[in-house]
Amino acid sequence: IRDRNYIAALSKTVGLIGVIAVFAITSVMGQSDSKGLMDMRWKDVAVKMPEAWYASDEAKLMAENVLLTQKAIGGWEKNKPYHHPIDASTKAAYLKSKDKIGATFDNDATITELRFLANVYSKTKDERYKKAFDRGVDYILEAQYDNGGWPQFYPVRKGSVAYSGHITFNDDAMVNIMRFLKELLSDDPAFQSMQLSDSKKAKIQEAYDKGIACFLKTQIVVKGEPTAWCAQHDSVSLAPAKARSYELPSFSGSESVGIVLMLMEIENPSDEVKASINGAVKWFEEHSVGRLRIDTQTMPDGSKDRIVVEDKNAPLHWGRFYDLETEKIYFCDRDGIKKDSITEIGHERRNGYSWFTRAPEQMLEKYPEWKKRNGIN
């Protein structure tokens, strides 16, 4: 009943089918039965449902929301639950803001919606989905800088959030774009169904190649050796750049990993790509902050606080940020002042940000196999 009520509400919003027809729909997936679509994350609904589900009336109704919310320029806003019903006032607001800045690649936005449209189109052949998909791909190509990088938002925002115009590796924004472009040229059935023209495929390949070149150009070089990357780089100078007040120019212990993993996927890598990977791996091998346990303790007033404990049985950790001069881990409050210890910053930032990461583990685990595959001793 819950899912039927959900479908009826969504149907009323977009006007696709009548209430009688909607109530005739039965649940098509065990995941929906056990958890309910409303309780799922949009990104999971978009790409992780059983293949047959994308032909369902539920999927078609959600596709109406995705069509409605696409910006005129071709992208989408972030953190929107497009699998939830959209009421009349919210629908009106979306229509009114079609031309406003807000389309982004942050938090998997735009890429998630395009994957969903491809999944639904492959099952329904509704040409509206293909048209929206094509506009979205064109948006990605338009947003790319001549140097191969992508901003977090396009068009770029102004004022205090102008950092969204930097080439953005933060939260794997550019890596996600690059992976999507690579998949567009693959044998994936959903993307094959879009029947991209040869000219469009050529543009996608060119954008991907420029993106790889951008990764190589932005890698921080220390004493002639390639090391890691910053979470964002200036779109003109390519230098490490500042984002929010506590996200200073630095070596990134997290975002660098996604870049290296993507470079490792390149077949027959060039000497420059090999040097990039080798340099990054060496840097991470030398910059672990040790075996740590990140605990949360309850304070006398009932609040929670994060503490870091050295533990020889715990996994290796790396810092989120490393100083560009000293290459030592640092922490930072909203005042933008670097601190040597997490205990030196305020409770809000100490507990509201990920200051440590284990992301390099995956890269280091894949490195021996990558060397063997490419004949590197």
Give the predicted meaning of each segment.
Residues S32-M62, R179, E183-K210, V236-A243, ...:
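Terminal, non-catalytic domain-edge segments
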Residues V14-T26:
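Bacterial N-terminal signal peptides
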Residues Y94-T124, A132, Y139:
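Long, hydrophobic/aromatic-enriched structural stretches that serve as scaffold segments
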Residues S56, K60-I111:
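N-terminal carbohydrate-binding/catalytic regions of secreted carbohydrate-active enzymes
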Residues I1-D3:
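Conserved small/polar residues in nucleotide/adenosyl-binding loops
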Residues Y82, I86-F105, G149-F169, A190, ...:
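A cross-kingdom feature marking solvent-exposed beta-strand/loop segments within repeated
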Residues M62-G74, A132-G149, Q205-G224, S276-R293:
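Long, well-ordered core segments of solenoidal/helical folds
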Residues T69, V120, A143, L184-D187, ...:
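Residue-level signature of the C-terminal ends
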